[in-house]
């Protein structure tokens, strides 16, 4: 089966987060020779398929175990859940349609197209040397992600089945297939700042202490400020205000406090501790409370790593494009792999219609992506 046929089938399952809708039974049916592990909580389902190709002969297994020599374990990872489709689609979002060289349907780009490509590549892979290939899928990436990939990796660690390397098939490309590989992601820190004042009558400002005036005095040092200068792969860390709230809604009462909600997407150069230190310095002598919570940590895979190099070579060979290595965008499940010391990168189709009405992926992209993934498998098994 090719990537197109598999992707069409995947799209037909209405797997809105965290629903799995039986899609894992279909995927398992494609891999009868793979072992299976499943886990999940709170309505989330996760699937892990794995197979050791060309395992050591029986007489060598004891020696193999004693030497603690394991074959390279490579994993393809992704999510089968999608965001709600909304209205105004030209066709039923869960009835895939091919039109003018594109496959339409919810999840075509994010990320059933990528999953279809690596499932097809895995089916066509037949190494000549010992090699452990696995596939990790979750129904909770678009949601909280607490019981998805993170949980499955914890289970794999308990069973000594963590992969050495992984590609997460997120839609990373911007204009043409092959123009972008994500070798890391920025971290994310959420914050709430409350500046305190004294409520009073708007006609008697001297008897009040308006916290909005206080905010105005420090706003240039908070809103949109760069927290570091970034580096070759990370943009400068930036603090972005996402919500402001103050007052009772009355036009003659000054507020007792103003609440500022913000987010900081940050590189390895900025931490929750350094952000707190910066803000406390800015807010010195101002009555306030500050809460910070890190929702994800930044990570990066070396640009010269074996996985990155092999992927780049296959993209250039198949797509005739030299990929840009970057860390742009939001968070992804790749961070959970990195937290376990796994060499991980992200690569997939163009992302111009992710989460959009009439989401689509080009048929040519699916064909080329499958070839890239198969080439990666073949090269890793030979090197």
From Swiss-Prot:
Where, in this chain's numbering, is Zn(2+) 1 bound? 79, 110, 170
One short Pfam family name for this protein? Answer: M20_dimer
Give the pathway listed in the UniProt entry for this protein. Amino-acid biosynthesis; L-lysine biosynthesis via DAP pathway; LL-2,6-diaminopimelate from (S)-tetrahydrodipicolinate (succinylase route): step 3/3
Q: Which GO terms describe its biological process?
A: diaminopimelate biosynthetic process; L-arginine biosynthetic process; lysine biosynthetic process via diaminopimelate
Q: Which PANTHER family match?
A: ACETYLORNITHINE DEACETYLASE (PTHR43808), N-ACETYL-L-CITRULLINE DEACETYLASE (PTHR43808:SF31)
Complex and partners: Homodimer.
- Protein name (record): Succinyl-diaminopimelate desuccinylase
Q: Which residues bind Zn(2+) 2?
A: 110, 142, 355
Q: Which residues form each disulfide bond in the chain? A: none
The record ties this protein, via InterPro entries, to: ArgE/DapE_CS (IPR001261), Bact_exopeptidase_dim_dom (IPR036264), DapE_proteobac (IPR005941), Peptidase_M20 (IPR002933), Peptidase_M20_dimer (IPR011650), Peptidase_M20A (IPR050072)
Q: Which residues form the active site?
A: 81, 141
User: What family does the Swiss-Prot or TrEMBL record give for this protein?
Assistant: Belongs to the peptidase M20A family. DapE subfamily.
User: What is the required cofactor set for this protein?
Assistant: Zn(2+); Co(2+)
Reaction catalyzed? N-succinyl-(2S,6S)-2,6-diaminopimelate + H2O = (2S,6S)-2,6-diaminopimelate + succinate
**Which keywords does this chain's UniProt record carry?**
Amino-acid biosynthesis, Cobalt, Diaminopimelate biosynthesis, Hydrolase, Lysine biosynthesis, Metal-binding, Zinc
What does the cofactor section's free text say about binding? Binds 2 Zn(2+) or Co(2+) ions per subunit.
Q: Which GO terms describe its molecular function?
A: acetylornithine deacetylase activity; metal ion binding; succinyl-diaminopimelate desuccinylase activity
Query: For this protein, what is the EC number?
Result: 3.5.1.18
């Amino acid at each position: 089966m090719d990537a197109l046929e598999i992707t069409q089938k995947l799209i037909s399952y209405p797997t809105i987060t965290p629903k799995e809708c039986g899609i894992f039974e279909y995927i398992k049916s494609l891999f009868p020779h793979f072992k299976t592990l499943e886990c999940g909580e709170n309505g989330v389902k996760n699937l892990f398929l794995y197979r050791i190709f060309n395992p050591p002969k029986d007489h060598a297994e004891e020696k193999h175990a004693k030497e603690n020599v394991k074959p390279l374990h490579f994993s393809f990872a992704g999510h089968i859940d999608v965001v709600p489709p909304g209205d105004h689609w030209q066709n039923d979002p869960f009835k895939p349609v091919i039109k003018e060289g594109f496959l339409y349907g919810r999840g075509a780009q994010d990320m059933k197209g990528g999953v279809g490509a690596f499932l097809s590549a895995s089916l066509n892979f037949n190494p000549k040397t010992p090699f452990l290939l696995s596939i990790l899928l979750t129904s909770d990436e678009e949601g909280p992600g607490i019981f998805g990939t993170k949980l499955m990796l914890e289970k794999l660690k308990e069973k000594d089945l963590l992969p050495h390397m992984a590609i997460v098939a997120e839609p990373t490309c911007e204009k043409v297939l092959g123009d972008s590989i994500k070798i890391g992601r920025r971290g994310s820190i959420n914050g709430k700042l409350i500046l305190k004042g004294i409520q009073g009558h708007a006609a008697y400002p001297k008897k009040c202490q308006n916290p909005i005036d206080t905010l105005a005095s420090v706003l240039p040092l908070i809103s949109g400020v760069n927290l570091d200068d970034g580096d070759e792969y990370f943009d400068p860390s930036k603090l972005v205000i996402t919500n402001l709230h103050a007052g009772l809604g009355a036009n003659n009462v000054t507020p007792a406090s103003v609440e500022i909600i913000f987010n900081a997407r940050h590189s390895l150069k900025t931490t929750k501790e350094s952000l707190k230190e910066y803000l406390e310095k800015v807010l010195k002598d101002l009555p306030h409370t500050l809460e910070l919570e890190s929702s994800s940590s930044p990570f990066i895979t070396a640009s010269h790593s074996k996985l990155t190099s092999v992927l780049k070579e296959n993209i250039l060979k198949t797509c005739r494009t030299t990929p840009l290595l970057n860390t742009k965008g939001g968070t992804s499940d790749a961070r959970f792999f990195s937290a376990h010391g796994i060499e991980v990168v992200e690569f997939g189709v163009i992302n111009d219609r992710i989460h959009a009405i009439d989401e689509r992926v080009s048929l040519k992209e699916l064909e080329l992506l499958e070839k890239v993934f198969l080439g990666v498998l073949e090269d890793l098994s030979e090197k």
